[in-house]
Amino acid sequence: MPTVEELYRNYGILADATETAGQHKDAYQVILDGVKGGAKEKRLAAQFIPKFFKHFPELADSAINAQLDLCEDEDVSIRRQAIKELPQFATGDNLPRVADILTQLLQSDDSAEFNLVNNALLSIFKMDAKGTLGGLFSQILQGEDIVRERAIKFLSTKLKTLPEEVLTKEVEEFILAESKKVLEDVTGEEFVLFMKILSGLKSLQTVSGRQQLVELVAEQADLEQTFNPSDPDCVDRLLQCTRQAVPLFSKNVHSTKFVTYFCEHVLPNLSALTTPVEGLDIQLEVLKLLAEMSSFCGDMEKLESNLKKLFDKLLEYMPLPPEEAENGENAGGEEPKLQFSYVECLLYSFHQLGRKLPDFLTAKLNAEKLKDFKIRLQYFARGLQVYIRQLRLALQGKTGEALKTEENKIKVVALKITNNINVLIKDLFHIPPSYKSTVTLSWKPVQKADANQKRTSEDTTSSSPPKKASAGPKRDARQIYNPPSGKYSSNLGSFSYEQRGGFRGGRGRGWGGRGNRSRGRIY
């Protein structure tokens, strides 16, 4: 084993030789042997090996392996020095291997070491992005779970920081192709991270790019398979995938496939849905997703059939008025409970799809069915007015901090919900029914309307649907707080899939626990 003095002497030989250093193979071999010495010798070797690496291509494997030994040394300072120098080995055909090595080193629990690995990866990204990605994806597909997890997180956080000259169209196409391979076997959390990665790529910001992403999500959601409402993982997967798809939909990227699936398979089983998430109102979550998607539904093959399913589900939440006794009082003794949050979602979805078949209520329903529906609408609208008056009275004069209490937040949400329902009911009371009004769903941020877009959820309410609306509360009072959820109960928060992690148990097609890939060091 060489001493410190021998290492310095051989370093001098190579340094003095400059461009002819390659002729002094023996001197470089002495430096390589320095990794077998003590701490001082190893520190010198960690610096000297990469400095002259380019002059000895025939010793490339030996040099890289020697540096790797130092990357695994027990002395943290030696490890850090060796890792810091790794990018100097990333030349030509060696770069993917160095990227692979650095990806494996992401499993380090030493924060300074971990940061060095991140910086080293970013530096070789700028040399050859595609080659670096090859190393990262190699470990994501075949590496140990901890390496896979950290490699995915590296991509999800660091890719967006790279300049356009690094993330070229060719590089982005490579990311998409490799991501598709990974998506064949992912957990729920990994899927969310990959959607974050892919949706951030410039080449996928186009209409065709968004359409590709929607198709990827649809494949993950397994929309061709039979829906099992009693399987929490099946339900959870559908909701998580749908939640990823919703931001991708637009007037040019349609939600038809998802809306059709929800109408045909999910709505009929709404009451049977199960979820592994404690405290989640799974039925409301499904209805909210359907409402959000319904705005972007394109031409649907079985429109009338699916509109009928939606209509039937809406009727379940719009009760008939209770029968009155001879003295005019409620014979049953108890008023039916009005589920405003559910009705907002269902009525909005029906209103959106109804635009595509405007004669559904008049031509597709018999007269008795239409009469029954209008009775339900009128009864619901009466209850709505009572509730709206109570809410306005409770919120009257309250501004600023007073509106930020939990109780008042709930009331503000409730007022948005009831205003929305009222606007939609008024539309359906037109003869023939109208589908022209525009409302903003209660859990969505309020969009600034154009001057000509007068009929929105800011429309005020009336004592009966067909009559002129009375004055409502001040507009700014309702816009102070835009809560995430449309259910006005003590639970205001909208369920966040991004913060939940993966699915439980086996996945079938990729959802659940991944197979065992532990292989030890594979440098």
Swiss-Prot record:
Residues 487-497 have a biased composition (Polar residues). Signal peptide: none annotated. One of its GO terms (biological process) is apoptotic process. GO terms for cellular component: cytoplasm; nucleus. A motif (Nuclear localization signal) lies at residues 454-475. The keyword Cytoplasm applies. Pfam families: API5 (PF05918). The keyword Glycoprotein does not apply. Keywords: Apoptosis, Cytoplasm, Nucleus, Repeat. It comes from the Eukaryota. Gene3D superfamilies: Leucine-rich Repeat Variant. Residues 460-471 have a biased composition (Low complexity). InterPro entries: API5, ARM-like, ARM-type_fold. Residues 502-515 have a biased composition (Gly residues). One of its GO terms (molecular function) is RNA binding. Residues 1-360 are annotated as: ARM-like and Heat-like helical repeats. Its main location: nucleus. Residues 446-523 are annotated as: Disordered. Antiapoptotic factor that may have a role in protein assembly. Monomer. Belongs to the API5 family. This is Apoptosis inhibitor 5.
